[in-house]
């Protein structure tokens, strides 16, 4: 459950360390975003020689949330923190690696690249 001003960690090797949500995409009055949703983020902390700089604005795909996601069988998949993968304007991942597990809910036509890069799909 990510909303404006939420801070997220980064789950790829794009060079960013911390992100801040500045807009939840998908409707003018949409308040929350969950796993599999695309948000607009600002880079708040970056590595010195990374691909991205502090202050840059990107799209990001949420891959882990503390709130979790409810499955059809009634189980709930929760993670220890909120994490996202940075995307370019064509919704392709900026990084070449994804760290940590990701949810199976990302398995759509648009985000199969992130599923294939992830070490574990839950």
From Swiss-Prot:
UniProt-listed SUPFAM superfamilies: Ribosomal protein L14
GO biological process: translation
Pfam families reported for this sequence: Ribosomal_L14 (PF00238)
Signal peptide region: none
One cellular-component annotation, GO: cytosolic large ribosomal subunit
InterPro entries xrefs: Ribosomal_uL14 (IPR000218), Ribosomal_uL14_bac-type (IPR005745), Ribosomal_uL14_CS (IPR019972), Ribosomal_uL14_sf (IPR036853)
PROSITE patterns for the chain: RIBOSOMAL_L14 (PS00049)
Top-rank taxon, per record: Bacteria
Residue ranges crossing the lipid bilayer per the database entry: none
Keywords: Ribonucleoprotein, Ribosomal protein, RNA-binding, rRNA-binding
One of the record's GO molecular function terms: large ribosomal subunit rRNA binding
Homology family: Belongs to the universal ribosomal protein uL14 family.
Entries under NCBIfam families matching the protein: rplN_bact
Self-association and partners: Part of the 50S ribosomal subunit. Forms a cluster with proteins L3 and L19. In the 70S ribosome, L14 and L19 interact and together make contacts with the 16S rRNA in bridges B5 and B8.
Function: Binds to 23S rRNA. Forms part of two intersubunit bridges in the 70S ribosome.
Protein known as: Large ribosomal subunit protein uL14
UniProt source species: Dichelobacter nodosus (strain VCS1703A)
């Amino acid at each position: 459950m990510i909303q404006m001003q939420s801070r997220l960690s980064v789950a790829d090797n794009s060079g960013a360390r911390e992100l801040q949500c500045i807009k939840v995409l998908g409707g003018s009055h949409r308040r929350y975003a969950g796993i599999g949703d695309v948000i607009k983020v600002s880079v708040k902390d970056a590595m010195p020689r990374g691909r991205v700089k502090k202050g840059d604005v990107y799209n990001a795909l949420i891959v882990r949330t503390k709130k979790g996601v409810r499955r059809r069988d009634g189980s709930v998949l929760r993670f220890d923190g909120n994490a996202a993968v940075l995307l370019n304007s064509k919704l392709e991942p900026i990084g070449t690696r994804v760290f940590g597990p990701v949810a199976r809910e990302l398995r759509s036509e648009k985000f199969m690249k992130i599923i294939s890069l992830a070490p574990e799909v839950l």
